[in-house]
Amino acid sequence: MTAPAFTAKAFAAFAPFTLLGAVTILVMLLIAVRRDHRLVALSTIAGLLLCCIALPLAAPASPVAVTKLFVIDGAALFYAGLVLVSALVVAALSWVYLDRVGEGPREEYYLLLLTATLGAAILPASVHFASFFLGIETLGISLLGLIAYAGPRGSAAEAGTKYLILSGAASAFLLFGMALIYAAFGSMSFARIGALAHQAGPADLYRLAGIALILSGVAFKLSLVPFHMWTPDVYEGAPAPVTAFIAVVSKIAVFAVILRFFALAGAHADASLRAGIAAVAILSMLAGNLLALLQTNVKRLLAYSSIAHLGYLLVAFLAAPALGVDAAAYYLAAYAVTSLGAFGIVALLSAPGAGRDADRIEDYRGLFRTRPFLAASLALMLLSLAGMPPTMGFIAKFYLVVAGVGTALFWPVAALLLGSVIGLYYYLRILVAMALPAPGDEEARHPNAVPPLGNAVIGALLVLLVVLGAYPAPALALIRMTIGHG
């Protein structure tokens, strides 16, 4: 790896992130010059597409340190790619969703989406507390605006307020944890902290306390028990495309940076931390699935489901770095495809001016008759979330179980298997509702015509879900090529 200076090689490796910043500035200028929803939406989608194309072009220049704050390597590019592709899908769904609003201020939404994506994209490359906190706060503050961005809907403003208060508390935990570690070692570099981690005495106590506080702040961002209370309310109140962004993009970014922090800081060796994380994983799996059983609101149900899925992901986190890195990467990819598809279908069936999204289970009655393609797609997405073959979700859970058993994580693996059985029941509730006849006029229950762009996005996600579920070798080869040798 080259020295931490901004050389030509570093500039080439950092180009996708620089391009994303330039696209953000361009969209801001477009909004200032001319308010045109179509133009701003197209510019956002085109800009994100260019950033996705730039990622493989930046790969030959990696691994390289970009100042002391970032390292662009295979892992950073892989997770940034997941973030950018997911943001591209959300931008396309947002165009369809906001196009139904009619007149009104819609353009700033895309600016917030881009700044949130920029914060999320730099997190996987962060190797310093300064870049870690900068990325997570850029993401969090932008999300605050996106959550409350719903015109006259009071539920969105309420969700935004809850997120503001609790996110501020989580940021305080993060900062205090970073301060304790800096007090112990006099450095904010992940690698430097790891090099000094063998020290015993007061410094080690500060380090453990600091890591525990950082994990508490991260647990809020990942919706892990007991820091999950905000999740169902925010998921329900936010516009459906924003819910998809929170469920996927923010989770990928935060999980990637904490995985890097633990690897470089040598925290995987601490038995007390591992025991605490295992307990959080088991509680998240069981609480998320059991609470989802009680829900009649689809977005709240998927919110509790996401809590359980992040608990599953902690099995790979605990198995890292021995077996869990590849399993975590594939699981995040599978989770991104399925969650984007599920929330995307909710967005396509929703009318923003109706006061709420199509988020009640009863709203989906008769969907197989009125919207057969969307109903079949949602059925496969839900089966993937349940871990059923031949979807990506099955392969992802299989690798989690293999990684967990291979590192003797028997209790978390048992909770994973039990949670998957419970989850199958509440996913089937939605499937049964879609197959039942709707009372009254079926067509009146799903009046929104789905534009070609919406069908194309869901179709692309569906192809990935089935093809990479039946034949996961290309995805696994990409993961091993980037993360395994990054």
Curated annotation (Swiss-Prot):
The keyword Membrane applies. It is found in: Cell inner membrane. It catalyses: a quinone + NADH + 5 H(+)(in) = a quinol + NAD(+) + 4 H(+)(out). The chain crosses the membrane at residues 11-31, 39-59, 76-96, 108-128, 129-149, 165-185, 208-228, 239-259, 275-295, 307-327, 329-349, 375-395, 398-418, 419-439, 456-476. Keywords: Cell inner membrane, Cell membrane, Membrane, NAD, Quinone, Translocase, Transmembrane, Transmembrane helix, Transport, Ubiquinone. GO terms for molecular function: NADH dehydrogenase (ubiquinone) activity; NADH:ubiquinone reductase (non-electrogenic) activity; quinone binding. NDH-1 shuttles electrons from NADH, via FMN and iron-sulfur (Fe-S) centers, to quinones in the respiratory chain. The immediate electron acceptor for the enzyme in this species is believed to be ubiquinone. Couples the redox reaction to proton translocation (for every two electrons transferred, four hydrogen ions are translocated across the cytoplasmic membrane), and thus conserves the redox energy in a proton gradient. This is NADH-quinone oxidoreductase subunit N 2. It comes from Acidiphilium cryptum (strain JF-5).
